[in-house]
From Swiss-Prot:
GO terms for molecular function: RNA binding; translation initiation factor activity; translation initiation factor binding. Component of the eukaryotic translation initiation factor 3 (eIF-3) complex, which is required for several steps in the initiation of protein synthesis. The eIF-3 complex associates with the 40S ribosome and facilitates the recruitment of eIF-1, eIF-1A, eIF-2:GTP:methionyl-tRNAi and eIF-5 to form the 43S pre-initiation complex (43S PIC). The eIF-3 complex stimulates mRNA recruitment to the 43S PIC and scanning of the mRNA for AUG recognition. The gene is EIF3C. It is found in: Cytoplasm. Residues 521-530 have a biased composition (Polar residues). Keywords: Acetylation, Cytoplasm, Initiation factor, Phosphoprotein, Protein biosynthesis. The modification N6-acetyllysine is found at K99, K642. One of its GO terms (cellular component) is eukaryotic 43S preinitiation complex. InterPro entries: EIF3C, EIF3C_N_dom, PCI_dom, WH-like_DNA-bd_sf, WH_DNA-bd_sf. Residues 199-215, 260-277, 885-898 have a biased composition (Basic and acidic residues). The keyword Electron transport does not apply. This is Eukaryotic translation initiation factor 3 subunit C. SMART domains: PINT (SM00088).
Amino acid sequence: MSRFFTTGSDSESESSLSGEELVTKPVGGNYGKQPLLLSEDEEDTKRVVRSAKDKRFEELTNLIRTIRNAMKIRDVTKCLEEFELLGKAYGKAKSIVDKEGVPRFYIRILADLEDYLNELWEDKEGKKKMNKNNAKALSTLRQKIRKYNRDFESHITNYKQNPEQSADEDAEKNEEDSEGSSDEDEDDDGVTAAAFLKKKSEAPSGDSRKFLKKEDEDEDSEESEDSEAWDTSSTSSDSDSEEEEGKQTVLASRFLKKAPTTEEDKKAAEKKREDKAKKKHDRKSRRPDEEEEDNEGGEWERVRGGVPLVKEKPKMFAKGTEITHAVVIKKLNEILQARGKKGTDRAAQIELLQLLVQIASENNLGEGVIVKIKFNIIASLYDYNPNLATYMKPEMWQKCLDCINELMDILFANPNIFVGENILEESENLHNADQPLRVRGCILTLVERMDEEFTKIMQNTDPHSQEYVEHLKDEAQVCAIIERVQRYLEEKGTTEEVCRIYLRRILHTYYKFDYKAHQRQLTPPEGSSKSEQDQAENEGEDSAVLMERLCKYIYAKDRTDRIRTCAILCHIYHHALHSRWYQARDLMLMSHLQDNIQHADPPVQILYNRTMVQLGICAFRQGLTKDAHNALLDIQSSGRAKELLGQGLLLRSLQERNQEQEKVERRRQVPFHLHINLELLECVYLVSAMLLEIPYMAAHESDARRRMISKQFHHQLRVGERQPLLGPPESMREHVVAASKAMKMGDWKTCHSFIINEKMNGKVWDLFPEADKVRTMLVRKIQEESLRTYLFTYSSVYDSISMETLSDMFELDLPTVHSIISKMIINEELMASLDQPTQTVVMHRTEPTAQQNLALQLAEKLGSLVENNERVFDHKQGTYGGYFRDQKDGYRKNEGYMRRGGYRQQQSQTAY
């Protein structure tokens, strides 16, 4: 029979086990007769009685505690989750809050959380270091807390005016409540449930109640004043229980707080309360003094908890070990064996390798060992990010540059060291100074990987931030390292390696405009001083000479098509960038790249598209609008210029590829500082199309089958015509459309004002290196094409027109007008003749007028209508109908309507 079904306490059951009969619990009996016949575990769970207010407020305080912990560790995602739960818990407690008022601790957490989020939001550096989830949660939570706090605006304002007072009021209120409850217990000499309730952590369970120590009571004396009212004498309780043996008493009465009955007990309790109040007052008075001392003591220093300030260096070798080449190489191989394995600390591995270099240099083990370890350090830095799309951190990137520079210093200082990827590890010579030192490794591969890492850094940095500018400054170091490796490989490398490093040098040179060389071309040598000439000589060769030298070497020595193709495209791009149109065009035509570029890999195709665009812009600067239009036609007509130039992905095409393909294509994008301005590109294309299309439309206005030179230009014209209300142009496209309409009328001044104005200068024309020359060229082209359009449009109106009049109208000199009209007459575009003595253009009027053109069109349409009707009638009558019998099959002999075929046949017979 279980002991837990006995009546009385544990002590009773223990003492009377042998001598007395156990009282059994009747099956199916009335439980109301023995309401507290419970086991110890049931006692612990059922004796805690809490009000609804306590339950709701405890739930709120637990959530607030979790939020504050998350705030300490800057876990904004956790803060967001707990804040949403806090709002729901507050909604459940709404009925209690309406009666009691909004608790102060709730207002405090709302105010503190809002201040905390504002502080995080203003910390720009901290936001950059946040992960994606925390950054997203910060934005969401900041909006939610601002919206939520509007309902508590007055409470938060009162709290912020005196936050300390609010905190003290809460503490005092809690103390008064606890003291008031204890006083009531003393006066009433009664027992309430709240008088003996304790937290689970404070309530001992099982037999441990008998063995509570005095130290436990001393530790909890400051937390609650209820401890003094508990009966500390276990012997008295035991004796009481012995006296009550055999009675069915309530077990909870053993744990009820007893009211002090004697005067001594009352005095002791009163003294304890006074001591506690005094301690509290001392703490309050001591707090401002401590704050002043802290402020005077200097600035605070933020430290990471749990991390020792002085980090001990890892021990590489046991104490007393002799450091030799074999020991260091063995240790190096041990470190490298963990490379790439799961769970390997890559940062610690890099640190160990750096420490190994330091040990090797301190023990004078030779440069060969140091070079080998340096190669592995750089390789470990590249392997730090296993994900291909992840770019290097700034500190790792700087460490990589420094390490490569140190490696190059060693190689240049020790010509007897030979490095190469074809050297086997068994044939390495790291310490024998009598023979040349041989180390396995490829410096060219390291530099190519460094260049790729630099590209990834630029791709993943916000191009409109100062951080991008700071990273772009590192290109000078990258170019310097490439130049040093170039000099090293020119002495000791193979032809293939030299071609590869030359291509790297070309890729960092081809897109840069050489302003110094351009300035020297504008300034004649006689006009420059001697110091300027000396400075120009010291600066080295121009970029044009450098590109010529590097590319010619690749043309002659390279055996791979890819390197030669890239070199040709970069060379053409550089020529076009510096307005050497004919050299760039001839090189493109001689290379025949346009015939087989579709078989090249995507990065080379992107480079080809960039080169063609730059070639078209160069032709436009030279005034060759037709060549410019032809070069830009393929890129602009596709509507995917941004994607074809590697400057971004289109949203509509994102749905056509999966996530992996998107990542691959994003890695192909060129960095922002290599981008070509797409608005400038479109403007150049549309202006070129306007200068070609408007005169052509005027010359073939009556031709129903005229072809379109540029579909995109016609599309922009149709969009402009569909506008119900035309206002002044705002965008670049609207300016070009408005200029086209003016050119149709031969109004070159209005056309000029739409193409060249302050807004267009800022958007397009000022971006050219020689902006004034481009604007002058544009004005001249607009005047010439407007003259051609005017003659095509109004030739039917004039019998003759003076060239001087045309010269005055379009502000062109007379020889230019004469040249334009002569070309039009020679090409049979204008049916006229020049009268040299009078300097007039005599129109021949062979072309039909507009009214005659309309009449001819009407006649053709009527003729086709009659023929269609006759065919329909023949089909209805059948082959043996009366029509064919009466006409004697004349229609089938081409003697139908107007007998045109017969007349022409007869005319041709008489010609013979």
